A protein has these predicted regions:
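Single conserved hydrophobic/aromatic residue that forms the stacking wall/gate
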Residues: 1-6, 10-11
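Mature hydrolase/peptidase catalytic cores and their serpin-fold inhibitory cores, especially
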Residues: 21-276
Length: 276
């Protein structure tokens, strides 16, 4: 027999979550992928590539979907078609740049950037362009939570001539190693994990065997669509403008979608080249 944390009612009431019981077979894989597609408006159509292994006991799946229009939409005359984007490997690629005038400028010793609001004013796109001579890899390697927090907490009011390329970004990651490097180790250890409250057969020791994460983001003149899905796989072991700034994202950059009320990023990634 198995039991779930607290009860199914508690999970639904406290976390607005859904609970499903199913045989872990090909049909379950298809059902889970269908759920992911529905929850992300089709932006992520598949999370699992293969049916669960025979020792798999539980999937915890979290989906985030973001679809917002710009507070200040782009007009046709704001779109520069056929512009040049210099990729991380130095190749020159074609991009369509979306030009706008923004009022929040971000900067520190290694980057310049800006914030552009979505309709409603709570969420904003943030573009960060490493200084000339600083590679995107080096910049990201030195980017800490503290540095991001400092940037987002201290925007400068001023005129920013900003340009964002139309782009699409997607990723598929297995996060176990990254989480272990951050100190989350016991949950992955079949002898140290204590997940008894989550259930399982009496003789089974539950532990986390994998953390799967997929994202998709699409940005154009209308706004941004983004989605993220994470699955935890549990197995049994046995002021007035005073200066004009210019930030053109025509080479590798960091992007974020930020909740400006909490100053926390919902999505964060890099663009190092244009599609195709």
């Amino acid at each position: 027999t198995t039991r779930l944390v607290g009860s199914e009612m508690c999970i639904r009431d406290s976390y607005d979550a859904e609970v499903y019981r199913s045989a872990f077979d090909e049909a379950m894989k298809n059902d889970l992928n269908h759920w992911v597609s529905n929850q992300t408006d089709g932006m992520i159509d598949k999370l699992l590539e293969q049916a669960p292994g025979e020792r798999t006991m539980l999937y915890l799946v979290n989906a985030v979907c973001f679809d917002a229009k710009w507070e200040k939409p782009y007009e046709k005359e704001n779109i520069q078609k056929g512009a040049v984007f210099t990729a991380a490997d130095g190749t020159r690629q074609t991009a369509d740049l979306l030009w706008s005038q923004e009022s929040l400028y971000l900067s520190d010793d290694n980057t310049t950037g800006f914030m552009k609001y979505y309709d409603g004013g709570r969420y904003a796109f943030v573009g960060l362009l490493p200084n000339e001579g600083v590679s995107i890899a080096d910049y990201v390697a030195g980017l800490t939570g503290g540095k991001l927090h400092a940037l987002l907490n201290d925007p400068q009011h001023g005129t920013v001539e900003a340009a964002i390329p139309r782009f699409k970004a997607s990723s598929s990651l297995e996060l176990s190693d990254a989480l272990k490097a951050m100190g989350v180790t016991d949950a992955f250890d079949s002898t140290a994990a204590d997940l008894r409250a989550m259930g399982g057969a009496p003789n089974d020791q539950l532990y986390v065997s994998a953390v799967l994460h997929k994202t998709y983001l699409e940005l154009d003149e209308n706004g941004t669509k983004a989605a993220a899905v994470t699955a935890v796989v549990t197995e049994a072991a046995c002021a007035a403008p005073t200066e004009v700034h210019r930030v053109v994202l025509d080479r590798p950059f960091v992007y974020m979608i930020v909740d400006t009320h909490a100053n926390l990023p919902l999505f964060l990634g890099t663009v190092t080249q244009m599609d195709g």
